[in-house]
Amino acid sequence: MSRLLLARHGQSVSNAVRRFQGVQDVALSELGARQAEALGQAISRLGIAAVYTSPLERARRTAEIAAAGLGLPLTSVHDLRELSLGDWEGRTVEEIRALPGDPYEQWVRDPVACLPPGAEPLPEVQARVVSAMANIAAAHPNGQQVLVVCHGGVISAYLAHCLGLPLSSIWRLTLSNCSITEVAPPSVRSVNSTRHLAGLAAGAPLSPSRLAL
C-alpha cells in the first residue's frame, strides 16, 4: 500500500492578502518559499519515491524547492489543479463579503449549493481528484512514499472522500500552507501536520474563518 504525503503549497502572494486565486497562476510569497524549504527538510530522509504536483505555479514552485535535494523529476498532473472559483478569482474575501447577502458566508456554510458564479462544481472536483490520487497510488505499491504537492481545495475534497464526509462540510477541515497530510488509501493517517514549520508563520490556514483558495 502506498503512502501519499499531501502537501498544500506554500503561502502565495494572494494568500497573504486573502485574495481568491482558484486556477489563476500566482507566485509564492517570500514566506511561502521559506515554508517550501522547511517542507524539503522534513521529507529529506523519508525515502520519497516520486514527486507529483499540480501544474499551477504556487504548487509547482513549492514542489521544486521542497524536492530540490531528492534527485527526482516532478510529474505534473492536470487533475491536481485547484478548483475554479469563477467570478471570484482575483477578488478578495472582503470584496465578496460586501456583496448583497454575503455570498462568501453562504459558500462557507454550503459550498455545494452556494457555488460562486462560473465556478467548478465540487462533485466534479472531487471526482477528478479521487481519480488522480488513485492513479498515483496504483503506480507506487508496496509501501512507497510519494509526495503530492497541490492545493487546499484538492486535499479537502480528497479527505472528504476518504473520511466519508459530505462535500458540504469540507471547509471545516483546517489545512495550513505547506502542511503535510498523510493518507495510505483509503486510510487517513494524519491531517495538517505543521511541526516542520516551527519558527515560521503557518501562512493562511484553510479554515472557515480565513478561507480563500
Positions of predicted regions on the chain:
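Loop-to-helix element that buttresses phosphate recognition and phosphoryl-transfer chemistry
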Residues: Q11-A66, L115-V130
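Acidic, low-complexity terminal tails and accessory targeting/binding regions
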Residues: S2, G86-E95, A138, N142-Q144, ...
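Short glycine/proline- and acidic residue-enriched helix-loop micro-motifs
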Residues: P103-E124, L213
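Extreme N-terminal starter segment of soluble prokaryotic enzymes
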Residues: M1-L5, A50
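Generic beta-sheet signal
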Residues: L4, Q144-G153
